[in-house]
From Swiss-Prot:
The keyword Nucleus does not apply. The keyword GTP-binding does not apply. It comes from the Bacteria. NCBIfam families: S16 (TIGR00002). Pfam families: Ribosomal_S16. Keywords: Ribonucleoprotein, Ribosomal protein. GO terms for cellular component: cytoplasm; small ribosomal subunit. Disulfide bonds: none annotated. GO terms for molecular function: structural constituent of ribosome. It comes from Staphylococcus carnosus (strain TM300). This is Small ribosomal subunit protein bS16.
Amino acid sequence: MAVKIRLTRLGSKRNPFYRIVVADARSPRDGRIIEQIGTYNPVDNSGENKVTIDEELALKWLKDGAKPTDTVHNILSREGILKTFDEQRHSK
């Protein structure tokens, strides 16, 4: 089973809110998920953190072979999770 880390869309029209989830690559965008690992709010104007990710879960799924989509890859890079993953992978 090919597993991807991707976004599912919530929120209303012109006010998106996304969950960062682990899902089967063949399931629809807002379809069945395996596990939720975080959230992303691109229109948050309050100055708070737009991204919340459970770093341990993200690293676990990356280690197990889940492939992030391009957008999630950028988010994980910005949060420093991919750097941690690369360090763990190359330290062995």
